[in-house]
Amino acid sequence: MTPTLLREVGEAIYGPRWQSELSRALAVSDRTMRRWLAGVNDVPDAVRAELRVLAQGRRKALDRVIARLR
């Protein structure tokens, strides 16, 4: 996973202040997140699966809200 994709997913799930929230959700430090984003360390493969679960959860929540707005 590239730092760019990590940033895109983080912003899509949590909005503009995504880094700290995503760090908490993944149980990693803010420093680890910054190192992934800077390309200092690779994003572990397991994080991709965790991000998929988080994104799917956000999508379900949004779908419920959208349904209520109809």
Predicted features by range, described:
Residues M1-G15, G57, A61:
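A short, Lys/Arg-rich alpha-helix, primarily the initiator
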Residues G15-P16, N41:
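Alpha-helix boundary/capping and short turn/kink residues
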Residues R59-R70:
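Short, charged recognition helix plus adjacent turn
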Residues P16-R34:
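Short alpha-helical DNA-recognition segment
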Residues V40-V53:
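Short, basic-rich loop-to-helix N-cap that marks the start of a DNA-contacting helix
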Residues R17-E21, A46, R64:
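Alpha-helix N-cap and coil->helix boundary residues
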